A protein has these predicted regions:
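Conserved small/polar residues in nucleotide/adenosyl-binding loops
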Residues: 348-354
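Proline-centered turn/helix-capping motifs that create local helix->coil transitions or kinks
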Residues: 43, 104-113, 155-156, 202-203, ...
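Solenoidal tandem-repeat scaffolds enriched in leucines and small polar residues
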Residues: 185, 189-220, 231
């Protein structure tokens, strides 16, 4: 049993209709203004301008973080979903213009990440743990799927597939490839969705590889040593000789402390966790993998019975935006990141039929 597509459901009144209208009429246009730095009093985004630079249209300098591209991709996904609900010529035109920028910025081999293209091109694929290359790719894929479903236009889908193929050439079990997995999970669930749309088995196999490899080697520690123990997020990017990515708390934070089939308790960064659990459950559904499904069920039981607030939020501590221990759900210091709540909704929406109790 799979969920209905957005375009196959029409909400006509009530609570959810009001929120749907709010998103369509107010939120998405406001986000467009933020992405174009038209909202006064807040830090600039520069996300769209970064793509203009990468496409050779602007001579400006990159601004933002290594994950800056994902903000634009998430907006494009929202537009794609909105266009499945109702037509909006103006919104579609804006999105098409952005997609043209993505096409112009993408490299010949499919690589697309404005931070590394513009700031540190020599360091591509050198910091998978911290720098969100694979995370951003996942959000582009999800945006492409939503936009294709909303418009029938396949330009962004071709861009996303080209990037996915680039990643597939870089990661995998073959001896000459990198034997790693995303630092911030997201790509895994996106690849399963891409398989569902294209029926290209290589995308399902790549998602399966990332899930199966997680927690089976010391990939993140090995790449950290290759970088001479320099952390991307440390001020001035200085050497951190005492940091060990093969020890607590870093393994738990990124959910590579155990192979995924052995994980029974939700731990670490809550957003990373539920994104990974979503991919696990979807893979279990596609492959008939009972062992993986049993792990998903145990994780679901742990979250819903012992690590979730009454309002459905998760990730109680601001330290690491993370799960802590069972029943540690304080009200006064509750963090419960919005992304974690959205991840829980996605996890539930996509996978509850698979792990039905």
């Amino acid at each position: 049993m799979k969920a209905l597509e957005i375009g196959n459901v029409k909400i006509t009144s009530g609570f959810w209709k009001e929120y749907q209208e709010l998103i369509l009429k107010k939120v998405i246009p406001y986000q467009w203004d933020i992405l174009n730095d038209k909202v006064k009093g807040i830090e600039k985004s520069h996300a769209i301008d970064n793509f203009r630079i990468a496409a050779g249209i602007s001579n400006d300098k990159f601004y933002g973080e290594a994950y800056q591209d994902s903000d634009l991709y998430k907006w494009l996904e929202a537009v794609g979903n909105a266009l499945q609900v109702e037509n909006n010529i103006e919104l579609e035109k804006k999105a098409d213009e952005v997609i043209d920028l993505l096409e112009g910025a993408q490299e010949e081999d499919g690589y697309l990440n404005t931070y590394f293209q513009l700031v540190e091109p020599e360091k591509k694929w050198s910091n998978i743990l911290e720098c969100h290359e694979l995370y951003c790719a996942g959000h582009l894929i999800e945006a492409a799927i939503a936009y294709y479903k909303g418009t029938g236009k396949d330009k962004i889908l071709k861009i996303a597939c080209k990037l996915a193929d680039c990643i597939n050439e870089k990661f995998g079990p073959e001896e000459w490839k990198m034997h790693g997995y995303p630092g911030h999970q997201e790509l895994e669930l996106a690849l399963v969705k891409l398989y569902d749309l294209t029926n290209e088995n290589k995308y399902l196999k790549l998602a399966e590889y990332f899930i199966d490899m997680r927690g089976t080697n010391q990939f993140f520690e090995e790449e950290f040593i290759k970088r001479k123990r320099i952390c991307h997020w440390t001020k001035c990017k200085v050497e951190e000789p005492n940091r060990r990515y093969n020890q607590f708390p870093y393994q738990e934070y990124n959910q590579f402390h155990q192979p995924v089939r052995m994980q029974k308790k939700a731990t670490g960064h809550a957003v990373r966790a539920v994104y990974m659990y979503t991919a696990m459950a979807d893979l279990a559904y596609h492959n008939g993998d009972k062992e993986l499904l049993d792990s998903c069920k145990s994780l679901w039981d742990n979250i819903t019975n012992k690590q979730i607030y009454i309002n459905g939020s998760i990730g109680s501590t601001p330290s690491g935006e993370a799960f802590t221990k069972d029943y540690d759900l304080p009200n006064d210091t509750n963090y419960s990141e919005t992304c974690a709540a959205l991840g829980t909704v996605s996890y539930t929406h996509l996978t509850l039929p698979t792990i039905r109790l």
